[in-house]
Amino acid sequence: MKPTTIASLQKCKQDKKRFATITAYDYSFAKLFAEEGLNVMLVGDSLGMTVQGHDSTLPVTVADIAYHTAAVRRGAPNCLLLADLPFMAYATPEQAFENAATVMRAGANMVKIEGGEWLVETVQMLTERAVPVCGHLGLTPQSVNIFGGYKVQGRGDEASDQLLSDALALEAAGAQLLVLECVPVELAKRITEALAIPVIGIGAGNVTDGQILVMHDAFGITGGHIPKFAKNFLAETGDIRAAVRQYMAEVESGVYPGEEHSFH
């Protein structure tokens, strides 16, 4: 199988072809996703909640991310693999580079970091040293204590203009992908159209170039609160492989996410 690359996603944006991505944490699911053609995966610090049982992503370490990245890479050798740099792993550009090197050696193709214009120097340093960067704006879970909970971000003119400014700054610094989480559809559309790089949404409507879901949400195996933007594809199909195919098909056709999964 031909490897999926950042250039593959850039072509999807140029061709206006939506693409699906998903979180993965282990060999078996990564292998299954790849076999069904779902070839963009994220080893997210969401593993702190879904795998380790914490109530936030904050306890996750670089070693945790590297361990799961290596497992996913073994299951999906040709996927485009993103890996989160967890809380306090990129407080300075130098620290970011050291920790990015660790997860890249484990098998990641790209690192994802949360934050806006304050990360410009870090993004520049990483990209200059051959570490591709995916930005993450909107609801950034590592900032849950600042936000006072998991809340929609970017409502109102000032907040939306700031997120657009952040997105443009990250792109100018060298970021090659951007994740937008829990923002109004209207803002997601503005940002997606303003950027040349692909934008991946989660809780950002169907106007972004791609979508991502935490795999546990996509299969309905998350305990407790279910995010508004989540859809249980396994409940509709009764088969994990069929659920993966349906998720991909609904993203590519624009059926998912629907209005019921979106914010305004």
UniProtKB/Swiss-Prot annotation:
NCBIfam families: panB, PRK00311.1. It is found in: Cytoplasm. Coiled coil: none annotated. Its EC number is 2.1.2.11. One of its GO terms (molecular function) is magnesium ion binding. It catalyses: 3-methyl-2-oxobutanoate + (6R)-5,10-methylene-5,6,7,8-tetrahydrofolate + H2O = 2-dehydropantoate + (6S)-5,6,7,8-tetrahydrofolate. Its cofactor is Mg(2+). It is an enzyme of class 2 (transferase). It comes from Escherichia coli O127:H6 (strain E2348/69 / EPEC). Binds 1 Mg(2+) ion per subunit. Its main location: cytoplasm. The gene is panB. Mg(2+) binds at residues 45, 84, 114. Keywords: Cytoplasm, Magnesium, Metal-binding, Pantothenate biosynthesis, Transferase. Pathway: Cofactor biosynthesis; (R)-pantothenate biosynthesis; (R)-pantoate from 3-methyl-2-oxobutanoate: step 1/2. PANTHER family: 3-METHYL-2-OXOBUTANOATE HYDROXYMETHYLTRANSFERASE. Catalyzes the reversible reaction in which hydroxymethyl group from 5,10-methylenetetrahydrofolate is transferred onto alpha-ketoisovalerate to form ketopantoate. This is 3-methyl-2-oxobutanoate hydroxymethyltransferase. GO terms for biological process: pantothenate biosynthetic process.
